[in-house]
Design a protein with these regions (language model features):
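A short beta-loop-alpha structural element at the N-terminal edge
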Residues: 1-4, 63-64
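Short, small/polar residue-rich loop motifs at catalytic or cofactor-binding pockets
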Residues: 15-18, 77-80
């Protein structure tokens, strides 16, 4: 919600174990606020700012049916930390670079049967 404050955003992130939250106004996605955005707001003494005030860029939005490879490539090329995922025009979730890394690790393990060692790069 665009009217939520920094404290509410922190609580939501902690409750759900996430580092990005969508900022919406009704059914419209205004953007994404990250943990880093909240740290910056607090460091600047802007604890009273609402989430709508923290959103500064147009979100990277993809449809549910988009290819993960295409989305991940676009995120990497554009240096974007998250993508807002819509399903039939409605917010379905957020895909983060962390999500992509976890999936990549699973695929690599499945296909290459990587030994589980501490010697990893």
């Amino acid at each position: 919600d665009a009217n939520a404050d920094v404290t509410t955003a922190w609580a939501m992130m902690e409750e759900h174990g996430i580092r990005h939250i969508p900022v919406t106004q009704g059914d419209i996605v205004l953007g994404v606020v990250s943990e880093r955005d909240l740290w910056r707001a607090q460091a600047e003494g802007r604890d009273d700012i609402d989430m709508g005030g923290l959103v500064s860029t147009i979100p990277f939005i993809v449809e549910w049916s988009a290819s993960l490879a295409d989305v991940a490539r676009a995120m990497g090329t554009r240096k974007i930390g998250s993508a807002v995922v819509l399903r039939d025009g409605k917010l379905a979730g957020i895909l983060t670079t962390t999500d992509v890394c976890v999936y990549l690790a699973e695929v690599l393990e499945e296909h290459y049967h990587s030994p589980n060692t501490d010697d990893a790069a």
